């Protein structure tokens, strides 16, 4: 089990690392060459800046029981197919029960934008988001440990 983070624009990295340190879990953070990222705990892997290069690297790297932190529903869907866990930086857990709906809603929003309609921007990050991320990362770590035994 590892925690793999799409770290290009991921708030809450410190909370992810805190949970990982407390549970002795390896963390790998991926970013492209346009982002500078440093960590005393996590392994930082830098990839080319090509279209979806970080996403593709994460999808290919994901293994069963890994925990993937991503905002991208497409990445979440792909890693769920590899029997990994997926969670957003706001702490929402993606699973087989909600990923199809999320992908469909993303499709509808993109279609509306192409048609000239305005869609809503994401809300600002809150302390509740931080707490949800930390608690749900711990929850997924425990689930992954149970599945490994």
Swiss-Prot record:
What InterPro entries does the annotation carry? UPF0178
Which family, according to the similarity comment? Belongs to the UPF0178 family.
HAMAP family for the chain: UPF0178
Quote the protein name from its UniProt record: UPF0178 protein NT01CX_0440
Q: Which organism is it from?
A: Clostridium novyi (strain NT)
């Amino acid at each position: 089990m590892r925690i793999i983070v799409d770290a290009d624009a991921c708030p809450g990295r410190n909370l992810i690392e805190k949970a990982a340190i407390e549970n002795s879990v390896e963390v790998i953070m991926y970013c492209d060459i346009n982002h500078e990222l440093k960590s005393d705990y996590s392994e930082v892997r830098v990839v080319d800046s090509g279209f979806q290069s970080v996403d593709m690297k994460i999808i290919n790297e994901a293994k069963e029981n890994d925990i993937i932190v991503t905002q991208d529903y497409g990445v979440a869907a792909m890693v769920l197919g590899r029997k990994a866990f997926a969670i957003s930086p706001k702490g929402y857990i993606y699973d087989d029960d909600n990923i199809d709906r999320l992908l469909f809603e993303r499709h509808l929003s993109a279609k509306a934008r192409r048609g000239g309609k305005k869609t809503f921007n994401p809300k600002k990050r809150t302390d509740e988001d931080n707490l949800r991320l930390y608690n749900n990362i711990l929850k997924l770590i425990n689930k992954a440990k149970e599945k490994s035994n």
